[in-house]
């Protein structure tokens, strides 16, 4: 097994889930995307994620969060801080909002190019694929696409708390964590942190349900311009950002801080989270399918040139 893949296994074992969408969400996106992969795309995923420890595509989906402690420069590549002000105004401008150090949008574009870059070695291609599997999830979490209060991390809230929410000691959550973890866990009946195998099982169950509920939504309807990734990624980012105006912060920060979000807010948020998880998975699958098709075409072209040289 390649050195990088050994590191991947170690990272996966060593850290407990505290990540965007929660590990359950990221794993569910990966499992759901896998159901829509073409045969060449499945081959590409299996080739790049090959390991002898039984780790699967859902483990790859959590890798980009695991390495942030060792590669701190990758932290800003999981989000973008647009100059928005929900609920009054929502917008994303790549030129204005993505700094020269990079953001989630530039990283998704760069990793798209790196997967099939013939100058990249297998480790670099594997890392690129794992970043994409993870970042498609992050992009569809609305609070990864807002500049307000560090993506909602600075908005302290209650969620299914016993104490009145006007008591600051009751505010055990921030808004970002509610969308990352509390809502996905409640959707799936999870009441505590899960270890590796139960977490996989919960994620697979969620993916199976979303697959059954969305059988008529075709994967080939999604944007797959891997040669010009921003043409697809920017509309997705704008869509996620708009959710902050339309729902996430629709009633304002003060209302969020005074309301237990585990009640009516959760009831309205749950179908939005389901839909965002599904869209992330469907778009990820279509993206990998396009990458696999492009890779196969490049290999055929190279084969023709080799024949001409003989």
Where are these regions (language model features)?
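Residue-level micro-sites within transmembrane alpha helices that shape
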Residues: 5, 139-140
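N-terminal, motif-rich segments that launch catalysis or mediate targeting to/interaction with membranes
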Residues: 17-135, 142-278, 282-310
């Amino acid at each position: 097994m390649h050195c990088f893949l050994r590191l991947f296994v170690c990272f996966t074992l060593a850290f407990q889930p505290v990540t965007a969408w929660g590990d359950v969400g990221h794993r569910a996106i990966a499992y759901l995307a896998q159901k829509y992969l073409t045969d060449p795309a499945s081959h590409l995923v299996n080739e790049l994620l090959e390991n002898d420890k039984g780790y699967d595509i859902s483990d790859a989906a959590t890798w980009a969060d695991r390495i942030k402690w060792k590669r701190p420069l990758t932290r800003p590549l999981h989000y973008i801080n647009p100059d928005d002000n929900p609920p009054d105004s929502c917008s994303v401008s790549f030129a204005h909002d993505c700094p020269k150090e990079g953001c989630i949008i530039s990283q998704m574009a760069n990793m798209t190019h790196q997967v099939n870059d013939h100058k990249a070695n297998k480790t670099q291609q594997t890392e690129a694929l794992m970043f994409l599997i993870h970042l498609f999830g992050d992009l569809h979490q609305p609070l990864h696409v807002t500049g307000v209060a560090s993506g909602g991390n600075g908005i302290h809230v209650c969620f299914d708390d016993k104490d009145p929410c006007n008591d600051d000691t009751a505010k055990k959550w921030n808004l970002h964590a509610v969308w990352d973890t509390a809502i996905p866990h409640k959707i799936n009946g999870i009441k505590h942190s899960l270890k590796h195998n139960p977490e996989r099982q919960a994620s697979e169950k969620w993916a199976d349900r979303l697959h059954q509920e969305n059988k008529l939504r075709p994967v080939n309807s999604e944007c797959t311009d891997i040669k010009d990734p921003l043409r697809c990624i920017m509309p997705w980012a704008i869509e996620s950002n708009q959710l902050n105006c339309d729902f996430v912060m629709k009633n304002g920060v003060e209302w969020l801080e005074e309301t237990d979000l585990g009640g009516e807010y959760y009831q309205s948020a749950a179908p939005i989270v389901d839909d965002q998880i599904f869209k992330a998975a469907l778009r990820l699958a279509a993206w990998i399918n396009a990458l696999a098709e492009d890779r196969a075409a490049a290999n055929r072209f190279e084969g023709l040139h080799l024949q001409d040289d003989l």
